């Protein structure tokens, strides 16, 4: 498994399990919102009023509505990841 997959899969899985609302920005600038229902190597199923299959190669950014904690694998540290920040958080 590549390093990219070893972060991507636990991140998406945590968002799915915890049913965290997400904003997904596509490479063409379109913003999609919903909850991650499922995912595989190539696609993400995003559920809102309808389910949408979004190809990963079209995704630029996944922004969770709140932080999620990733499970520790092979002794790695657990780090909160994601969430939105206010403009005055700097």
From Swiss-Prot:
Signal peptide: none annotated. This is RNA-binding protein Hfq. Residues 9-68 form the Sm domain. InterPro entries: Hfq (IPR005001), LSM_dom_sf (IPR010920), Sm (IPR047575). The keyword Hydrolase does not apply. Keywords: RNA-binding, Stress response. Belongs to the Hfq family. CDD domains: Hfq (cd01716). Pfam families: Hfq. Homohexamer. One of its GO terms (biological process) is regulation of RNA stability. RNA chaperone that binds small regulatory RNA (sRNAs) and mRNAs to facilitate mRNA translational regulation in response to envelope stress, environmental stress and changes in metabolite concentrations. Also binds with high specificity to tRNAs. GO terms for molecular function: RNA binding. PANTHER family: RNA-BINDING PROTEIN HFQ (PTHR34772:SF1).
């Amino acid at each position: 498994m590549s390093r990219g997959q070893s972060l991507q899969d636990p991140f998406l899985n945590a968002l799915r399990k915890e049913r965290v609302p997400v904003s997904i920005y596509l490479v063409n600038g379109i913003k999609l919102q919903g909850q991650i229902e499922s995912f595989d190597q190539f696609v993400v199923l995003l559920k809102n009023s309808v389910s949408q299959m979004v190809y990963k190669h079209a995704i630029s950014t996944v922004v969770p509505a709140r932080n999620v904690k990733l499970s520790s694998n092979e002794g790695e540290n657990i780090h909160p990841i994601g969430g939105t920040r206010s403009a005055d958080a700097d």
